[in-house]
């Protein structure tokens, strides 16, 4: 017993040998690929954070982007206040940057429904002058609902044309499926239409239905504006009728 205790005490008194550690610094180099996607290579964020017009998302200038958008859409005219962040969200589609940035999907859905409501009201109240008033009272034109023109007012083609005519497309952040092919194949029509609807949804959710309705009636459905949805829809309907007429004429030849 005494021998075992002596052995333990001796073992505890043994000096502890320090471990020799050699610290080495290792430098790693990460290659960030630019250009077309290649499997296994990490892409440079800058390559997918630019929109088709070359604008870098992280370097958006408020004066060059948001302020111009406010002016184009005449937001101050209706007392509408949208933050820079919300405007940028309205301009950003889900396809951009793998959906990592705030995008406009829900605002688009909200705005599309409110636009349909306002265009229905517009169609009900806008008939021919002779039919609009009966006995000095406003007559609602229910026959206007469901017409080709009424449907065209809220079509994606009409909204897309509105965005292009007002030069909003350079500010839109989205990803082209194939940069070599034209915008139609890349889904440009749907994406541009979603931006206009998103602005309506943003105005409705932050400024209220009254200002949103005034914005639609004043900026989008003004007959005096050559680039309004009303005049664009009229041109689209006339163009469609002309194409049908041409086909019928060729069929008889």
UniProtKB/Swiss-Prot annotation:
GO molecular function, one term: ribonuclease III activity
Keyword Transit peptide: yes
Cited InterPro entries: Ribosomal_mL57, RNase_III_dom, RNase_III_sf
A Pfam family per the record: Ribonucleas_3_3
Alphabetic keyword roster: Mitochondrion, Ribonucleoprotein, Ribosomal protein, Transit peptide
Subcellular location: Mitochondrion
Presequence boundaries: 1-28
Any one Gene Ontology cellular component term annotated for this protein: mitochondrial large ribosomal subunit
GO-annotated biological processes: mitochondrial translation; RNA processing
PANTHER family: 54S RIBOSOMAL PROTEIN L15, MITOCHONDRIAL, LARGE RIBOSOMAL SUBUNIT PROTEIN ML57
Subunit structure: Component of the mitochondrial large ribosomal subunit (mt-LSU). Mature yeast 74S mitochondrial ribosomes consist of a small (37S) and a large (54S) subunit. The 37S small subunit contains a 15S ribosomal RNA (15S mt-rRNA) and 34 different proteins. The 54S large subunit contains a 21S rRNA (21S mt-rRNA) and 46 different proteins. mL57 forms a heterodimer with mL44 and stabilizes rRNA expansion segments 1/2 at a membrane-facing protuberance close to the point of attachment of the ribosome to the translocon in the membrane.
Family statement: Belongs to the ribonuclease III family. Mitochondrion-specific ribosomal protein mL57 subfamily.
Role, per record: Component of the mitochondrial ribosome (mitoribosome), a dedicated translation machinery responsible for the synthesis of mitochondrial genome-encoded proteins, including at least some of the essential transmembrane subunits of the mitochondrial respiratory chain. The mitoribosomes are attached to the mitochondrial inner membrane and translation products are cotranslationally integrated into the membrane.
Note in the entry: Present with 6500 molecules/cell in log phase SD medium.
Name assigned to this protein: Large ribosomal subunit protein mL57
Organism per entry: Saccharomyces cerevisiae (strain ATCC 204508 / S288c)
């Amino acid at each position: 017993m005494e021998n075992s205790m002596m052995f333990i005490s001796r073992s505890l008194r043994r000096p502890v040998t320090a471990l020799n550690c050699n610290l080495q610094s290792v430098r790693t180099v990460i290659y960030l690929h630019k250009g077309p996607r290649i499997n296994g290579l990490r892409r440079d964020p800058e390559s997918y954070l630019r929109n088709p017009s070359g604008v870098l998302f992280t370097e958006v200038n408020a004066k060059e982007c948001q302020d111009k958008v406010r002016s184009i859409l005449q937001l101050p005219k209706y007392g509408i206040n949208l933050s820079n962040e919300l405007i940028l969200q309205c301009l950003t589609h889900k396809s951009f940057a793998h959906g990592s940035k705030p995008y406009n999907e829900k605002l688009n859905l909200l705005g599309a429904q409110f636009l349909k409501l306002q265009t229905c009201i517009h169609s009900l109240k806008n008939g021919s002058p002779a039919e609009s008033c009966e006995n000095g009272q406003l007559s609602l034109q229910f026959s206007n609902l469901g017409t080709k023109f009424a449907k065209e007012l809220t079509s994606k083609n009409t909204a897309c044309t509105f965005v292009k005519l007002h030069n909003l497309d350079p500010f839109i952040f989205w990803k082209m499926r194939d940069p070599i092919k034209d915008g139609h194949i890349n889904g440009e029509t749907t994406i541009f239409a979603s931006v206009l609807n998103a602005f309506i949804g943003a105005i409705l959710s932050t400024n209220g239905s009254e200002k949103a309705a005034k914005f639609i009636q004043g900026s989008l459905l003004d007959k005096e504006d050559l680039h309004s949805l009303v005049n664009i829809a009229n041109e689209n309907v006339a163009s469609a009728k002309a194409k049908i007429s041409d086909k019928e004429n060729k069929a008889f030849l």
